[in-house]
Design a protein with these regions (language model features):
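Structural transition elements
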Residues: 1-4, 16, 21
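N-terminal hydrophobic or amphipathic helices and topogenic motifs
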Residues: 1-8, 131-132
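Short, well-ordered beta-strand elements
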Residues: 9-17, 38-39
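Detector for C-terminal structural segments
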Residues: 18-29, 48-132
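Short glycine-rich hinge loops at helix-strand junctions in the catalytic core
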Residues: 35
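Short acidic low-complexity segments
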Residues: 39-48
Length: 132
């Protein structure tokens, strides 16, 4: 109940780019149904500041997400800072043993999800069909 009161009378701004305007509208519509007011802000590029951002992030095949989450990186768009996450990302980049590296990145993923620096809406799947 206290969380609901903290949003009472406030309008949240959802920033996005044109390609994701429909996704942002869907989020705004869902929030409206539960009484959360929001407005869309469609920009041409990644904004410097935002309340809520719906933006595509391409994750690498390798689990190293140093450029996305390490506090020293300009590409850390959420400005997230967590010393434990920083250390795991640093260790993962330098570890050569694949089993140890796997454990490091599993810990990174677990702590990142527990800390909630971002809400991951979905991971789209794209298919390409071609003739040989």
């Amino acid at each position: 109940e206290q969380e609901e009161d903290s949003l009472s009378g406030k309008t949240l701004e959802i920033s996005t780019i044109a390609d994701y305007e429909n996704v942002a509208s869907g989020v705004a519509s869902s929030w409206k149904k539960i009484g959360v007011a929001s407005k869309l802000k469609v920009t041409m590029s990644l904004p410097d500041t935002f309340q809520i951002l719906i933006y595509p992030i391409k994750l690498p095949i390798d689990p190293d997400q140093y450029v996305l989450w390490h506090s020293s990186q300009l590409s850390n768009i959420s400005k997230y800072k967590n010393l434990r996450i920083d250390k795991l990302l640093e260790d993962g980049r330098t570890e050569l043993d694949q089993e140890i590296r796997k454990k490091i990145y599993l810990d990174f993923q677990r702590f990142l999800v527990e800390d909630v620096p971002a809400v991951f809406l979905y991971h789209p799947t794209f298919y390409t069909i071609s003739r040989k």
